[in-house]
Amino acid sequence: PPREGHLVKARYMPDQVMVTGVDEQGTAHHGLLSQPIGSLDLEGMPVVVADLHSSLPAVLAGLRSPDGQEQPRVAYIMTDGGALPLAYSRVVATLSRAGWLAGTITAGQAWGGDIEAVSVHNALLAARHVLRADAAVVIQGPGNLGTETPWGFSGVACGDAINAIATL
């Protein structure tokens, strides 16, 4: 079916998709996210960055409050280092149904989140300012890549996420 929006994800692949991004011109949050660099930040929102998608449940369990207390609003940001469609993650589907996630954001070439973003930077800002998350977790989609060389594994992208957090 035709999709609205102008962001193309999985570009030049036979199954590329067009989505509406939170940061796209003409959308409700474009004005917010188009503020000058330095005028919008994470407002102290804690962010956990991890490499393995399978670590998401453990990270979320660590962020949860004791029973009977209000639970934090946690956003999951899926980067494009693993599988690109969020729907490939049974873990996210289970955690969403359980109410452990305030929302999902797919960044870069990944797609299928509650919110789509062009970059990890805008995904982080959307987590805080659109989803009103108390915390965010940045982890690639399911599946990772490695070549047994010091720099040849998909986990090095965690450094890119940390740089985005430090910048914001």
Protein language model regions, located:
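Extended, charged alpha/beta regions that create polyanion-binding interfaces
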Residues: P1-G44, S54, A58, D67-A75
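Acidic/glycine-enriched edge-of-secondary-structure segments
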Residues: L40-D51, A107-D114
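Short, glycine-rich nucleotide/cofactor-binding loops
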Residues: P46-H53, T149-F153
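Short beta-strand segments
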Residues: V49-D51, I77-T79, T106-A107, V138-G141
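Phosphate/oxyanion-binding active-site loops and adjacent basic polyanion-contact surfaces
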Residues: D51-L56, L84, I115-V120
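The AdoMet/dcAdoMet-binding core of the Class I SAM-like
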Residues: G62
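Non-transmembrane, aqueous-exposed alpha-helical and coiled segments at domain scale
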Residues: D67, Q71-P72, A93-V138, N144-L168
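Conserved P-loop
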Residues: Y76-I77, A83-V91
